[in-house]
Amino acid sequence: MINRLVIVAALMFLASCATRQDAPGDSVSQVESSGEKVDSFVETEIVTPGMLAAEKLASTEPSVYFDYDKFEVKEQFALTIEVFAEYMRAIPGSRLRIEGNCDERGTIEYNLALGQRRADAVKAVLVSMGIDGDRIETISYGEERPRNSISSEAGFSVNRRADLISR
């Protein structure tokens, strides 16, 4: 019997020590009744330099075009290449593949070699901008991957390109 009295006394003691916490609904109604306005939670998105560079990259034409039988990078494509360089600087683990392409004129062997020179020329510009050449792969498809199959100068000019593909 004494054991039961001790247990009941201990439970009453613990119950008297407990504090009452208001339910979440009570505090909201108190704030609303006091006239204060409660703003809803605003979610803030953190934007990193890598995210900005990726967004800029997504809105950039990923090709550099060349004149007939040439592999010199024209000044008008400096901005395109710079966007890829910014992306690679912002995301250190990123890699790039540059695919050289040609129009259908010339032999298969000649166009494969010219496509490789085009890809290598774009890579050289990126390396001159401080990008590690080991992060850039070049390949030539020659005339095998045309964008336009129309045999005209307009069609040919679209096929003389180096495509930049981030990975």
What are the language-model segments listed below?
Residues P92-N101, Q116-R147, R160-R167:
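A non-catalytic structural micro-motif
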Residues F13-S16:
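C-terminal motif of bacterial Sec signal peptides marking the signal peptidase cleavage site
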Residues F71-L79, R105, E109-R117:
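Soluble non-cytosolic domains of exported or imported proteins
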Residues S149-S152:
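Short beta-alpha junctions and helix-cap segments that line functional grooves
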